[in-house]
Amino acid sequence: MYPLARRILFALDAEKAHHFTLDALNMVYKLGLIPVTGNRTKPVKLMGLDLPNPVGLAAGLDKNGEYIDALGALGFGFIEIGTVTPNPQPGNPQPRLFRVPEYQGIINRMGFNNHGIDAMIQNIEKSKFSGVLGINIGKNAVTPIENAADDYLICLEKAYAHASYITVNISSPNTKNLRALQGGDELSALLEALKNKQAQLASVHGKYVPLAVKIAPDLDEAQIEDIAHVVKSVEMDGIIATNTTIDKSSLGSHPLAGEQGGLSGLPVHEKSNRVLKLLADHIDGKLPIIGVGGIMEGRDAAEKIRLGATAVQVYSGLIYKGPALVKECLKALARSAQNAV
């Protein structure tokens, strides 16, 4: 059924199709036509959290937490919403989202378009979702990069009571200079400030909410080693590898290869896995990794687990394969676990 729906959706503008799909999913959910499945097929512990299974939804699909309940009915082990910023912002001018079906890729330069952290919290409070919910936080475009920590601290404080875990997004290529925060000194200063605030908030709220950081696939081994050193030294709870790539050489002479933005889907698969493997080697089991990037079928999820991830997230694969991808990943992980025995 989804291949037919995809043909119709792919005839629409990519961003319009995105909103139409989520609105339709929400309507079907509210009509009770989506059977809520727990999918406790492969429970796993992640950052101290009990996941019913290790296949999660990556940030970016539901930026404002408007579709949490409907997405929660699709069998994910956890859901991540955002990226959210302190204040609402429109993001970059349209068009800013492009499909590259010949390569099973997506290019986006959305620019953290969202309604702001306060609106997101209102949506979370209206939700009935009781599963593991991650909130992905970023900085406003107008905030100077030297003041970025202020924005992350605002979001952390406001999101803390409503999140199962919080992800610090420093790897989007669509906010000017954001990726500079991945550098050693800048990264250390930012994460130390956030860990200090986390400790204060844990005392105030009487609960510990884990902090993860999301990194880019466009890193060399020295940069990956530096990041691994920092996240271990500040005692981050987890790391997400990876975001989208700015390298579009895999698209060859495709007309969209010159578009600005981050490329996701199948073209980022190898880059993401390379970073994941190197990161796992340098982290040496000190904190868990969530693998994301280029999971287009079940065996891709199993490969990320073999490379060192504790859990995985999907996004672009959902656009191309539909919700059935979740079950396909879970089946592949189960087969992989059996073969390893």
Swiss-Prot record:
| SUPFAM superfamilies, sorted | FMN-linked oxidoreductases (SSF51395)
Task: State which Enzyme Commission number(s) the record gives.
Answer: 1.3.5.2
Q: Which GO terms describe its biological process?
A: 'de novo' pyrimidine nucleobase biosynthetic process; 'de novo' UMP biosynthetic process
Q: Residues that bind FMN, according to the entry?
A: 59-63, 83, 136, 169, 214, 242, 265, 294, 315-316
* Metabolic or biological pathway: Pyrimidine metabolism; UMP biosynthesis via de novo pathway; orotate from (S)-dihydroorotate (quinone route): step 1/1
| Record-listed substrate binding positions | 63, 108-112, 169, 174, 243-244
How does the protein's chain sit in the membrane according to the entry? Peripheral membrane protein
Keywords assigned by UniProt, alphabetized: Cell membrane, Flavoprotein, FMN, Membrane, Oxidoreductase, Pyrimidine biosynthesis
Spell out the subunit comment. Monomer.
Instruction: Summarize the protein's role.
Output: Catalyzes the conversion of dihydroorotate to orotate with quinone as electron acceptor.
Please report the name of this protein according to its UniProt entry.
Dihydroorotate dehydrogenase (quinone)
Organism this protein belongs to: Neisseria meningitidis serogroup C (strain 053442)
Gene this protein is translated from: pyrD
